Amino acid sequence: MIDNIDDPNDSSDSSRAARARMRRREAQRAKLRRRRMWSVPAAAAALVLIVVLASADGGPSKAPGSKHGATGSAASSPTAIVSGGPVAPVAVGGRAALWASHNVVGVQPGTAAAYQAASKLAGMPGYLLIADRGNNRILVVNARREIVFKFPNAADLAAGRRLFYNDDTFVEPGGQALIANEEDNNDIVQVNLADRSLHVVFGHPGVAGSNGSLVHTPDDAYMLPGGTFTVADAYGCRVIFVRAHRIVRQYGTSNVCRHEPPRYLDAVNGDTPTPDGGVLISEINGSWVDEISSSGKLRFAFKAPVSYPSDPQPLPGGRILLADYANPGHVLIVNRHGRALWRYGPSQGPGRLDHPSLAMALPNGDVVVNDDYRHRVVEIDPRTNTIVWQYGHTDRPGTRPGYLNIPDGMDFVPAGPNGGPDYAAVVHP
């Protein structure tokens, strides 16, 4: 059974251990924040000017029909371009640009139709996969907040299939499996959806390191088309690409932690794939966001206007969606100069965020956010800056249906023709 930690004052060994893990994790991150504050700012000020893309403040750099326009055979723009608000304004192709062929990693049958249908729905426009980290489980819920998938279930636990501090979890290309980084267990695992088998695909469970077979606090494992996956080795200060248990590419130098990409990276907590084979990286110290091309060259680097950048996500028009892992936390859309184009972040009240770790764009133009330490996932309408959908009870961790405990990862799954989750249609970013 999964330990019930509904009561924050629970004195059981499992609850004490969970709280101790949270304290250790926050202490480690606080140490990194202090290190950032003590660093000499002059070098950072010079580095921020290294590279800047020629695009203007989030607007499109090329006309529709060019490489970066909102066209594509499988995901062509509808006759009337519908604005996705700040997430996908008409100027960059509207909502259709969110799933246009040049804005997704890989081409999968059914994606355009599934996402176009979802773009017309208010609220949660499909299914949401949630990495319920504090409860060591993965959930998939529908718009009515009903659980349609859970791993592990009782049979999985009886068979010895269990998760340990599973962090970010994403659907793999093709929809046959899920990939998850077990951050505090120092490994990456794969869950097969058909037979519910569980496999360690990199790292040694419970052993931290940063060499050819070990990772130290892995974050954001993404499976790429072709069988290679990328993961941020957070405190190894590198981003690695792994295939068949072997590192086949690496950005950053193992255990050399400083900002000089791509040769050196500081503590890394984001490594989002870009459509053309590059990677969008967030470094904790200095609040850096970097993009490295598929050939390994630095495209740009800027200081994000946040205290702790987390998991940057590419948007149409050269813009970036970013979470600020702080309390109160924020969600921003920035351009490649680091200028904020949109920001959400109430300082108090029910809309306040407490250490949001990931923000993702939905096909309907809303933004869904992991609100880690308020134990919920919220959907925000960026046109009104209001929460329009929520899973989890605010400030109340738990294991019962409707409850979460430090949700730290998620993925959007559109509905298929039969109304169920269409894992095969999922694309990233």
Model-assigned labels for residue ranges:
Residues I2-I5, M22, A63, I81-V82, ...:
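Hydrophobic/aromatic hotspots within intrinsically disordered, low-complexity regions
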Residues A46-V48:
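Hydrophobic multi-pass inner-membrane translocation pores used for secretion
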Residues R35-A42:
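Short, hydrophobic alpha-helical membrane anchors of single-pass surface/secreted proteins
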